[in-house]
């Protein structure tokens, strides 16, 4: 089965899900209420990683809708993406980086997604005219890197990705190009079955301007032999891979799991990059967010089990005002630093806030 057919064959309805798990009438009703607002898509490969006998299976929690999504606590745009949109599908929050929203589709719709407002839904936020995006980037010489995101850009046809890379390669002030993707966890056949994609990536990853994949692995169970094959092919075709993990309640909120994940990533050739505090997104916050106090304890305990390479990541909140690193907690204060800032005057700023046991975001701190 080719990757396109595998993607089309994903599970997206209650009836299809019932091929894998028995649902009560009440569960069907609750699930139906969720799907009216936020659709489901799970690749059958990703479903195969779930242990259905384990009610607390971490991949099940990340991929399968639940009644907890009926909780409306939080906001849909927690990072100010609307404010940072310059033209449709083009966000320019940090002076050196432009983010392109290339699609609203993914191989699997993660239930904790911070772009829940647009994934799998009709939206006006997605890039439609790539020429306009390229022109914007060309006219802003301060930009030195591009993040092609979505949705998942690797769900796009290889010809579309080729168009992106062809135009971006002509912009001389770019130092590197990144693809934000979960495809290695959710549908690794996208990599292993498309030789044209691999040739395209290799031909555009030069000694002085590399192609990066920024992956998202949140649990060691997502790393399989098929993942290893995909990672190995990317590395052999000159792609550099780094990873962003989201700290998620009921998935990786214990130090053993977090340490095992980061150590495994290093061993297969993926560089730990960020661990993100789960954002207070509507229909996500109360189901997935870990309090900052507990999150810091988990991360610090996990670091004791890691090599230096494993703990190169930064534990951050991706806030409206910038990426805020959690430096430490002492005497009921949490110490924070702007690792990235929308206002460049804030860059590098260190500050402290009073911490409590339940605070999960900057606005929750005193």
Model-derived segments and spans:
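A short mid-domain helix/strand-loop element embedded in enzyme catalytic domains
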Residues: 103-115, 131, 136-141, 194
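Flexible, acidic/Gly-rich N-terminal and inter-domain linker regions that tether
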Residues: 1-93
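Mobile, glycine- and charge-enriched loop segments
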Residues: 112, 141, 227-253, 333-336, ...
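Conserved AdoMet/S-adenosylmethionine-binding subsite of the radical SAM
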Residues: 131-139, 154-306
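Conserved catalytic-core segments centered on acid/base and nucleophilic motifs
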Residues: 100-101, 112-113, 145-148, 152-154, ...
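Conserved, mostly hydrophobic/aromatic
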Residues: 46, 110, 273
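C-terminal accessory regions of radical SAM enzymes
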Residues: 296-366
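Canonical Radical SAM [4Fe-4S] cluster-binding loop centered on the CxxxCxxC motif
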Residues: 92-127, 179
